């Protein structure tokens, strides 16, 4: 029974991902960079995403997320979770299972506002006390498939066992996004 349920879930995910658009993005802040990829992140239904954030002083974070996009009038809400690998420069590498979501508001054909928040407490984290990620910004489509974006990203790995916190990202960024 478990194999059938797992095969059904995997099939739904693959069907949803193949129908919906793929997006690739890159952002650069003053002291960090972020690279991301997503399947179905701009349409209703299942969405799969992944990203890698790097900071020379505070370490690396890589994550894979699964969400469900739901229409709410002019907004699209996402609820879901992320599996995150953490490698802080000050502390032990580990993982976090974060839960959260986001909102997108498409204004016209070219402009979109967005925000998201994910959190993992100590009970769902290893090597860190907690994981916290927030991102908010605006995206303007220059010419499909290319858009530019600007926003603010905060990603913090709270220290554990006497290790200090590692703010992998904390500041404004600019970026580019391509959706196919």
UniProtKB/Swiss-Prot annotation:
UniProt keywords, alphabetically: Cell outer membrane, Membrane, Signal
Q: Does the keyword Oxidoreductase apply?
A: no
Record Gene3D superfamilies:
Porin
The subcellular localization recorded is: Cell outer membrane
One GO cellular-component annotation of the UniProt record comes to: cell outer membrane
Query: Which residue positions does the secretion signal occupy?
Result: 1-21
- InterPro entries, from UniProt? OMP/PagP_b-brl (IPR011250), Porin_dom_sf (IPR023614), YfaZ (IPR009998)
Q: What is its main location?
A: membrane
Q: Which domain of life is it from?
A: Bacteria
The protein depicted here goes by the name: Outer membrane protein YfaZ
Q: What is the lineage of its organism?
A: Bacteria, Pseudomonadati, Pseudomonadota, Gammaproteobacteria, Enterobacterales
Tell me the gene name: yfaZ
């Amino acid at each position: 029974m478990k194999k059938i349920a797992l095969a059904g879930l995997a099939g739904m995910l693959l069907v949803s991902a193949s129908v919906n658009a793929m997006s690739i993005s890159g952002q650069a802040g003053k002291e960090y960079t972020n690279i991301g990829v997503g399947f179905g992140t701009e349409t209703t239904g299942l969405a799969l995403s992944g990203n890698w954030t790097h900071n020379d002083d505070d370490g690396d974070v890589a994550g894979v997320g699964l969400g469900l996009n739901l229409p709410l009038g002019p907004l699209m809400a996402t609820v879901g979770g992320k599996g995150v690998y953490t490698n802080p420069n000050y502390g032990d590498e580990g993982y976090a299972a974060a839960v959260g979501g986001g909102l997108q508001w498409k204004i016209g054909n070219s402009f979109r506002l967005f925000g998201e928040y994910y959190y993992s407490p100590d009970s769902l984290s290893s090597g860190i006390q907690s994981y916290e990620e927030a991102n908010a910004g605006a995206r303007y489509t220059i010419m499909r498939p290319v858009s530019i974006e600007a926003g603010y990203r905060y990603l913090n790995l709270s220290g554990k066992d006497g290790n200090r916190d590692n703010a992998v990202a904390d500041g404004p960024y600019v970026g580019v996004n391509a959706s196919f």
